[in-house]
Amino acid sequence: MTDVSVSKIRNFCIIAHIDHGKSTLADRLLQETGTVQAREMKEQFLDNMELERERGITIKLQAARMNYRAQDGEQYVLNLIDTPGHVDFSYEVSRSLQACEGALLVVDASQGVEAQTLANVYLALENDLEIIPVPNKIDLPGADPERVKREIEEVIGLDCSGAIEASAKSGIGIGEILESIVHLVPPPSDTTGEPLRALIFDSYYDPYRGVIVYFRVIDGTVRKGDRIRLMASGKEYEIDELGVLSPNQVQVEELHAGEVGYIAASIKAVADARVGDTITLARARATEPLPGYVEAKPMVFCGLFPTDSDRYPDLRDALEKLQLSDAALQYEPETSSAMGFGFRCGFLGLLHMEIVQERLEREYNLDLITTAPSVVYQVTTLDGEVLRLDNPSKLPPPQQREKIEEPYVKVEIITPENYVGALMDLCQTRRGIFIDMKYLTQERTTLIYEMPLAEVVTDFFDQMKSRTKGYASMEYSLIGYREGELVRMDILINSEPVDPLATIVHRDKAYYVGKALVEKLKELIPRHQFKIPLQAAIGSRVIASESIPALRKDVLAKCYGGDISRKKKLLQKQAKGKKRMKAIGTVDVPQEAFMAVLKLDREG
């Protein structure tokens, strides 16, 4: 790797909604610049995780360095920093954007601008990036690049006169994209002489070398063997290996301001090298860290329990290993009378939760029971103490608390206009507060609502997709906590409260949710030898109940005729046995029953 002058470096990323062709475009750029040979090429080269390919989404960030000889004959280094497109990973996106000077805005020419594209574009504009619009998939029969350009101009306010119409799949427009990156994206500022400051934009755990940190040098120079300090955690390490990603790792001796690379420094856990942290030298320290570092805070919590309690240590090890590569995942041990030992885990959002569960099941062969997702409530007790609760079963009784506050989010939904009525109805039933409605074009509308996060985390996304035949897209951001009429609803099975089924609900909806839940449990819990009452209760007041009838063994089968008192004796003996069983018998609750809370139709 030869030294490159800063003026020949271009750092850029690709912003796109899921399925608009970002990973395919990245593949084409790697091929066009000769970074990856055709025979090594596989679809979605930068999406390393099997799960990413399967779901067609980018979860962890990747980076690739490409050498490109432009038409002016000069050799340039282009660093592509990949970004996840999904709303749960918006913090990761904001850090990748901080490491760039430019962005390609990829929009599907047949679909138009979507909600998550908008959210990421606003982040890019905040970071003062040069944005190049690229209407993609122009060879599709339904493509209308002119309409998409108009949409970008109207909605985002970007000038689309220099937009490049492309099709990543057929390779149309790839050369023009590379040229425009060279000419439009500004080079990094040359601050090689200043104390080292480098931004960590991703890290992953390698079982042999420890944590591999991906970073962008903002100021100064970093060399192999340097002793570095991470400014947020205050820990120091020695660099064992320094290199660039091309896209496979290639070792180098030093990297200067503006360059992107990776280091291995025997770091034990990803939590020690947090994304967004600043790397500086241990001796010649920078005085100020780079701005914008935020510790990722989990928004959604749920309990994870192994179906076989002997595998609890395996689950603990798996979570420890996952946390090495996913700093946003939090967990703490939890016990439950119904499910034994497990963990209470915190996630960035619903997609993050699903992905972690799938990775645990897939990569570590675990069978898991998950409880209903809940959000973090703020409870003010009568003596003025503020508690943050992520578990409904820990809620203090009503006589000890002054108020409960729940997190609210601002939800932006972009939808074809003929589904507006159905979506407004959905938002209304989810306690949404209507804020605004804008027409992007004649046939597409943005709806803006404020609603409780608890109503969004269950199945709001699925409901939104099914009511709009899959056409709507959404984006949400936290706006703060608000007081609400919230109560804790317990579910009693055979008069015993079952912790994992407890939920915090709004008082107005408690009856509907309780009724739906006990009806669902009645379908899912198998019949036993004794009658099982199912009840939904708020405090000591039962608000909905159902019962599962007993299985009856025919004890009179052996009596052929004969005395009635003989039959009575047998029936009374059976009744006594049932009574004793009911008192001491345990109810076997299947995994599906716990999942029922997730899949409940919450329309009340």
UniProtKB/Swiss-Prot annotation:
GO terms for biological process: positive regulation of translation; translation. Keywords: Cell inner membrane, Cell membrane, GTP-binding, Hydrolase, Membrane, Nucleotide-binding, Protein biosynthesis. It is an enzyme of class 3 (hydrolase). It catalyses: GTP + H2O = GDP + phosphate + H(+). One of its GO terms (cellular component) is plasma membrane. It is a peripheral membrane protein. GO terms for molecular function: GTP binding; GTPase activity; ribosome binding. Its EC number is 3.6.5.n1. The keyword Protein biosynthesis applies. SMART domains: EFG_C. It holds the Pfam family GTP_EFTU_D2. It is found in: Cell inner membrane. Residues 7-189 form the tr-type G domain. GTP binds at residues 19-24, 136-139. PROSITE patterns: G_TR_1, G_TR_2. InterPro entries: EF-4 (IPR006297), EFG_III/V (IPR035647), EFG_V-like (IPR000640), EFTu-like_2 (IPR004161), G_TR_CS (IPR031157), GUFP (IPR027518), LepA_C_sf (IPR038363), LepA_CTD (IPR013842). Its main location: membrane. Belongs to the TRAFAC class translation factor GTPase superfamily. Classic translation factor GTPase family. LepA subfamily. Required for accurate and efficient protein synthesis under certain stress conditions. May act as a fidelity factor of the translation reaction, by catalyzing a one-codon backward translocation of tRNAs on improperly translocated ribosomes. Back-translocation proceeds from a post-translocation (POST) complex to a pre-translocation (PRE) complex, thus giving elongation factor G a second chance to translocate the tRNAs correctly. Binds to ribosomes in a GTP-dependent manner. This is Elongation factor 4. The gene is lepA.
